[in-house]
Amino acid sequence: MTGRQREREQRPQPQTGDQGHPRRWLILVALCAALLVIVIDNTVLNVAIPEIGRTFDASTGELQAVLDSYVVVCGGLLVAAGALSDRCGRRRVMVAGLVVFGLTSAGAALAPSVWWLIGMRAAMGVGAALVMPATLAIMVRVFPPHERPKAFAAWTAVGSVALGLGPLLGGALVDLWSWAGIFLVNLPFVAVALAGVVRLVPESRDPAAGAPDLPSTVLVTTGMVALVWAVIAVPERGALATPVLAATALAVVSLAWFGVRQRRASAPMVDFGLYRDRRFAGASSAIALIAVATGSTLFVLSQYLQLVRGHSAVVAGMAALPLAAGSVVGSALGARAPARIGYRACIVTGFAVTAAGFGVLAALGPDSGQPHIAFGLLLCGFGTGFAGPAATSTALGAVPADRAGMGSALNDTHQQLGIAFGVAVLGGLLSTAYRAFLPTGVPHDASTSLAATLSFADERTSAALADAARLAFTQAQSATMTAGLACALAGAAVAMLSLRSGRRAPSR
């Protein structure tokens, strides 16, 4: 650390009070740049999934692991990372996370096998875990309560732009270069985000924060990794297979031990008392459920567009634009709507619209056109965008200021675990249903994914089998989207039953 940096950190920061930090909107720009790095990486990967599957001859389970290794590790470390940022400084931890993310992105681009890629994705999850809690904690600190919905809406809108930009960029890189380009493109984004964070974001910390609990971090991460792996492995190995049962047992023991440690700790990583607040518990549950619903959407549709409809990666990437556009518009309206119709009404309405979008996507057939897909994704994006600012404000507004790092980390954890289980559970449903709808007589190795079946059919010049495989995937996709619809409606029901109506900005 240079003398100038040390002097800047030691200099008293302006108090936020009711007016907020005087540079809060510039700070938000820097935080959104960091968010952009993380979201683009996740969305860019979905478009490359079919190409990665062909390159490494990967099964559906291995492709799920490529996505989930990042999400599960990130989710498992978020709470510890939040505690670390509270103790060591939120800006410092964010900078470290961006550096780790950039280095491991380069390592992923050089992957010689699918398991190397899975390992690098897990390491990227470490970097993302260091970045995410700090962003929301800093936003809560520099923005007064009445401006937070606007700030969260801008934050959500940037994520939505990345949601549209990522697949389009990824498709171009895959078509013009290779899947490795989707990881190398992270490097310039990381450099820009680092410059903005170092230059604009003030340092902040909680003087009373304790050291991160390493044993508890290991327990919760191990438990979640084991549980998600067990769910992913069920379609290929069976629910009663020894490895699946062993992973499930490891998950139960690890997570139970984690819970016991937290209840006995004088300064726990997770304050379970937060969940006694209906606002925090209700909003967090709703956020997790909508993440389950939406987590596998692009994973599934990318394969549908490229392997069933025969589109290029660029065209598949363009299909995500309505999702992003809907989310941007929804976020803009959702930032102002709580003051007019209330926070609960915003969440319930948004999730209901998202459920309608899944209903449209569940009706897709092998020959459905782009307008059908675009309309479904537009509804999904608008609904989640409209509900997002109210849900985030409600959850974080229930957290005391001195627990901002923990609260934002838990908020991110609920989202990441929702996405992880969405990919694992709904991806598992896709895989199981696909096998069930395939004609009898297809060898096991050829039924592990649509790409594997199409390759098998091509070797035997069987156009009939290829057509049957595409139909089977479309039917399995409909089952998956119907499950997403159910999750979105469940999120709306949780918000309706657990949250109170009202238009006041949530605050503790």
Curated annotation (Swiss-Prot):
Q: Where is this region: Disordered?
A: 1-20
Q: PROSITE patterns from the entry?
A: MFS
A molecular function (GO) held by this record is:
transmembrane transporter activity
* Residue intervals passing through the bilayer: 25-45, 65-85, 98-118, 123-143, 154-174, 178-198, 214-234, 240-260, 280-300, 313-333, 345-365, 373-393, 417-437, 479-499
- The yes or no answer to whether the keyword Coiled coil is present is no
- Cross-referenced Pfam families: MFS_1 (PF07690)
Q: Name one GO cellular component term.
A: plasma membrane
Membrane topology value = Multi-pass membrane protein
Please give the InterPro entries that the UniProt record associates with this protein.
MFS (IPR011701), MFS_dom (IPR020846), MFS_trans_sf (IPR036259)
Biased composition, class Basic and acidic residues, residue ranges: 1-11
Q: Which UniProt keywords apply?
A: Cell membrane, Membrane, Transmembrane, Transmembrane helix, Transport
Q: Where is this gene product found?
A: Cell membrane
Name the family the entry cites. Belongs to the major facilitator superfamily.
Supply the name of the protein. Answer: Uncharacterized MFS-type transporter SACE_5813
Q: Which organism is it from?
A: Saccharopolyspora erythraea (strain ATCC 11635 / DSM 40517 / JCM 4748 / NBRC 13426 / NCIMB 8594 / NRRL 2338)
